[in-house]
Amino acid sequence: MSTVRIIAIVCTAQVFAQIGAFAVPALLPTFIDRWDLSGTEAGWIIGAFYLSYTATVPVLVSLTDRIDPKRIYLGAVLLTAVAALGYATLTDGFWSAFVFRLIAGVGWAGTYMPGLKALSDFVEGPQQSRGVAFHAGSVGVSGAASFIVASTIASWFGWRWGIAFGGVCALLAFLIMAFLLPSREPKPAGDAGQAGLLDFRPVLRNRSALAYSLGYCFHTWEMNALRAWVVTFLTFALATSGGWTTLLAPAAIATVLSLAGVWASVSGNEVARRIGRRRFIICVMLSSMAVACVIGFTSGISYELAASLCVVYGILIWADSSSLTAGTVGSALPRQRGATMAVHSTLGYAGGFVGPLAMGAILDLAGGESAFAWGIAFAHVGAIMALGLLAMVVLRPKDLAGDRDN
C-alpha cells in the first residue's frame, strides 16, 4: 500500500476519534454553573483525562514494539466511544464526570501515539517527519472543530447530545482502522535489539530524544491549559468588557485559534527543517512565554483584545508541536521507537494533566475569576515554559535527517 494512502487512512481515523476531544472544555462554563463547580473541581474534570492518559500510555505505547499498533488502537478507540456516550447519558455531577474523563484518557492513550506508531511503521526516512506533521495536523483540525461542533450541537439539542456526537464518531474511527489499515506485526528484535517492556533506561540515555520529550512536556502543559480554559476565560472577558458576540463568540474563537494552531504546527515543522529544529523551537518558546505573561490581564480591558491575543497565543503554542514530536520520533532508534514515544507521550501528558489543574487552582487562590486572577494564572504558564527552554539549551538535541541546518 502506498505511503500516501497509509497516511490518509490513519489521519482520517484520527479526525473521527478526536472530534469529541474538547467537547467537555467547550461546555465547561455550562458544567460549572449546572453543578456549582469550583475552579479546582473544574480543573480536575479536565485534568482527569490527562491523569489516566499519563498512567496508561507507557504500557500501551511500549506494547507497540511487540504487537501490531492497530490492535491496541481498536480496543482503545472503543473505550473513547464508551467514555463519550457514558458521559452524555449518565453524568450528573463532579464524580461521575471525573470517572468518564478517566476512561476517555485511557482511550486516547491507546489511540493517539499508537495511531502515530502505526503510521510511522509504514513511513520511513525523510518523509517520516512530514507524516508526523500531517498526523498532528489531522488531530489538531479535528480537535479545533470539536469546540464549535460541541457548542453548536449543545445549543440545538442540549449538552448531552454535544458530548454524545464524539462517541458516535469514535465508532466510525474504529471501522476505518479495522477494515482499511493493513495489519503489520513488529519484526522480532533478537536478544539485544529490545529492552524490557517498561525498561526506559536506553531511551533516557538518548539525549536528543529526551530533550525533545522534555520540551514537549512543558509545551503540552501550556497547550492544554489554554485549550481547557480558553472558553471560560473568554466568557469572563465577554461578560466583563462586552464585545461582538455573533462573530467572536468564545467557542468560535477557540475553534479559530485551534485551526490556526494546526496550520502553525505543520508549517512550523517545515520551518524547523529549513532553519534548524532546535533554533526554531527556542525562538517559539521565548515568544509564547512573552504572550503568556500579559494575556490574562487583557480580560478586563477589551474582549476583542483578549480574543485576538488568544489566537496569537494559540499559533505560538502550536508552532513547535510537530517539530517536538517529529524530533523525538526521528531521534529514536528503530527498535526503541515505541518505548521512546511512550516516554515522549508520558512526559507530555503529565504536563497536560498538571496545566489545566494548576490554572484552576491558581484562579481559586487568586480570589476567583477576575482580570488579576486570570493574569496570574496565565503568567504561571510563561514561568513554566522556562523549564522547556532550559532542556533545549542544556541537552542540545540534534537536528534530523532532512533538516537543512545540521
Language-model regions, residue ranges each:
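Juxtamembrane intracellular "pre-TM" segments in multi-pass secondary transporters
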Residues: 184-213
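Conserved MFS/SLC helix-loop-helix module at the cytosolic interface between two early adjacent transmembrane helices
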Residues: 55-91
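C-terminal transmembrane helical hairpin of 12-TM major facilitator-type secondary transporters
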Residues: 278-324
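C-terminal ends and interior cores of transmembrane alpha-helices
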Residues: 78-92, 287-300
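Helix-loop-helix hairpin linking two adjacent transmembrane segments in secondary transporters
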Residues: 135-181
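Extracytoplasmic gate region of multi-pass secondary transporters
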Residues: 24-25, 209-255
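Cytoplasmic helix-loop-helix junction between adjacent transmembrane helices
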Residues: 100-138
